[in-house]
Amino acid sequence: MSTINNTRDIKNVMVRKASGEEEKFSTKKLIASLERAGADFDVIDHIVNDVHSWIFDGVTTRKIYDRAFSLLRSNKFATASRYGLKKAILEMGPTGYPFEHLISRVMELGGYSTQTGIVVDGFCVTHEVDVIATKNKQQVLVECKYGQSAGRVVSVKVPLYIHSRVNDIIRKRQTLPEFEGFSFQGCIATNTRFTTDAIDYAKCNNMWLLAWDYPVGQGLKDIIDRERIYPITVLNNLNKAQKQQLMEVGVVVCRQIHAEPKVLDSLQLTSRKLSALLNEVKNICG
């Protein structure tokens, strides 16, 4: 059996990211992503050596991902599902509604009670807030920016705009007796990334940002992997139409299926297909 060299990168091989930027290929990054997906040593060893055998200058990170996913899938279904997390979130569209519910679940894991898609009064005008999260007289007003392209970035224009909206809502709520003693904070959540200017502006104005890999170690991918709140779009035993049907009735994360398998009744799956799906869900949720 071959072994992985954990310290060696393929020297001078440049890969192209979804944004069009180029960076040196890192074996360490590939290993880390496979470990997060739950792949065991032998599977990681096989995939890394496979990638080393064909990687070339200018190859896209998507091509590397697709190859790794294919090899994972041939070894372990649930592991492949978790490795496909970024792609799965990109498949939650075309509307941002399922993503809003995913973010709502993330906030609930932090001890917040949540509401989604709420129209509220500001001091000057009314506003629709994607997620309102409340805990111990602290209220977070969340704007969700869902992107269906991995290369998309959220520019400084977004926190500039959201900051003014949040301030209008806060100004109104500070006049209402039911919000006496409350503190408020604006938040922007995205499945993509923020520009440096967007991050700087948000920090300067006490806004909470949540992106795919921001804050470092506490980004969306980290929370989902740690808490195992995977969207149903990771599931290999459901087709696109079936996933869409479930999301339309509010079934957005695998935990919902794990807790209440009856939500699948409307799909009219065969007993064999249902058994395979529930087994995949069980393995994913842990």
Per-segment meaning from a language model:
Residues 45, 97, 237-240:
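Amphipathic alpha-helical repeat elements characteristic of tetratricopeptide repeat
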Residues 25, 39-42, 59, 154, ...:
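Short coil/turn linker and secondary-structure boundary residues
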Residues 46, 119, 214, 258-259:
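Proline- and acidic/polar-enriched loop/turn elements at helix boundaries
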Residues 16, 143, 258:
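Residue-level detector of conserved, well-ordered beta-strand and adjacent loop positions
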Residues 1-92, 99:
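Long, C-terminal-biased catalytic regions of enzyme "large/alpha" subunits
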Residues 38-41, 68, 72-230, 247-248:
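Intrinsically disordered, low-complexity Ser/Thr/Pro/Gly-rich regulatory segments
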Residues 103-106, 225-286:
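C-terminal extensions
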